[in-house]
A protein has these predicted regions:
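Rossmann-fold cofactor-recognition segment
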Residues: 6-24
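Conserved mid-core segment of classical short-chain dehydrogenase/reductases
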Residues: 50-65, 108
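Active-site helix of classical SDR
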Residues: 79, 115
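Active-site loop-to-helix junction immediately N-terminal to the catalytic Tyr of the SDR YXXXK motif
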Residues: 106-113, 125, 153
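C-terminal helical subdomain
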Residues: 139, 155-191
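Active-site-adjacent segment of SDR/Rossmann-fold oxidoreductases
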Residues: 104, 125-136
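Residue(s) in the substrate-gating loop at a strand-loop-helix junction
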Residues: 99
């Protein structure tokens, strides 16, 4: 429906069903894409979930495992089928969608923040591994995007963006060949300031902040 709404010709797009939490499923989808569409210029690993977590609750450990399976293992599996052929061609871009939440941990967001911090570090590692190959690795760190999921949040979301505005800015960043970009730029400034805060100041600033809703909380 999305592609049809954009008026794309049928030969220019194809949907491939896959379960991002199952490595072989997502790798197979990538291989089917290569077989039917050829090698793309850009691969974007965007799948992600965000569920509140309380480490004292046993079932929330499973939430953390699911979060990492989706946000991290799924991301690497998405890239996997395309790395060798892109390297052989000497061009291409692998884009990992992280989050400003990966810059500092937020109470009640342990699984999500940790997973997005891991995305940032993983993409940085992969960028170094592919240096000189012609394949770029781009890390995009969105702030708050207005979606049905974020509308469930119980706290203020500064600099909230509409999805199309974010997509346009992300496209521009990828096209410009940047290696890392926080969108919108205001959240990038906020994130840098938060990173510089001493722990005692940061902890005090977040005291009493509403937490992300847990799956059964």
């Amino acid at each position: 429906a999305w592609a049809q709404g954009l008026g794309l010709a049928p030969e220019r797009w194809q949907a491939y069903a896959a379960d991002v939490q199952v490595v072989d499923s997502i790798v197979d989808a990538g291989q089917r894409c290569l077989a039917s569409q050829g090698l793309p210029e850009v691969v974007i690993a965007n799948a992600g979930i965000s569920i509140g977590m309380d480490t004292a609750v046993r079932e929330d450990i499973d939430v953390m495992a699911q979060t990492f399976a989706t946000n991290n293992i799924g991301l690497a599996a998405t890239f996997h089928p395309f790395i060798a052929p892109m390297t052989q061609r000497g061009s291409g871009a692998l884009v990992g969608i992280a989050s400003v939440a990966g810059i500092r941990g937020l109470p009640g967001h342990g699984a999500y923040c940790a997973s997005k911090a891991a995305v940032i570090s993983y993409c940085e590692s992969l960028r170094g591994e592919l240096r000189g190959s012609g394949v770029k690795v781009v890390t995009i760190g969105p702030g708050y995007i207005d979606t049905p999921l974020t509308r469930q949040n119980r706290y203020a979301m500064p600099f909230l963006m509409q999805p199309q505005d974010f997509a346009d800015k992300a496209f521009a960043a990828i096209s410009a060949g940047v290696s890392y970009r926080v969108i919108p730029w205001q959240m990038g400034v906020v994130a840098k300031l938060l990173r510089l805060l001493p722990n005692r100041v940061f902890d005090k600033a977040l005291a009493g902040r509403p937490r992300k809703k847990r799956r059964n909380g």
